[in-house]
């Protein structure tokens, strides 16, 4: 009888531990996924991914001047002063964990300015292909990756590009705000979407 009681108590303890672990796992899973169904990838997670394989991070440009009442940096087709501050803050946080990357942008004033303020002096390459947002963008990404297979890549592009990629790769509805991003990688000639970048 005593042995049975001990066994029963052990079983109850085991069940309680399992339930607690399941609850923790459930919370972790909830926190690790965005409401749109994309995995959330913060700076530290991105750094761990970059140790496994080079990453490609695509950002939407910073706040547009022509759609804001905030002060413009310069050209009306560019970004606002607030946009430059936001881009610099994001760049500082990003570079703390991923210091080594090649930098690209589409050929618009707003993406060029965003990339410039993000990078704080890093060489920027402008590529007009990054304005095209169908399957062409995958070809562009693979081409850029092939030039430096071991380097991480940061690309400044547009909301419709990010929306297209999320829908095409994971059937997710992604409506990016300014400076929101997606994390991808190239493997054996294919481009994969890992998740949504979250600057935490």
UniProtKB/Swiss-Prot annotation:
InterPro entries: His_Pase_superF_clade-1, His_PPase_superfam, LipoPS_heptP_Pase. Coiled coil: none annotated. GO terms for molecular function: phosphatase activity. It is an enzyme of class 3 (hydrolase). Keywords: Hydrolase, Periplasm, Signal. It holds the Pfam family His_Phos_1. GO terms for biological process: lipopolysaccharide metabolic process. Its EC number is 3.1.3.-. Its main location: periplasm. CDD domains: HP. GO terms for cellular component: periplasmic space. Pathway: Bacterial outer membrane biogenesis; lipopolysaccharide metabolism. Induction: Induced by BasR. Expression is significantly induced in the presence of zinc. The keyword Hydrolase applies. Residues 1-25 form the signal peptide. It is found in: Periplasm. NCBIfam families: PRK15416.1. Belongs to the phosphoglycerate mutase family. Ais subfamily. Catalyzes the dephosphorylation of heptose(II) of the outer membrane lipopolysaccharide core. This is Lipopolysaccharide core heptose(II)-phosphate phosphatase.
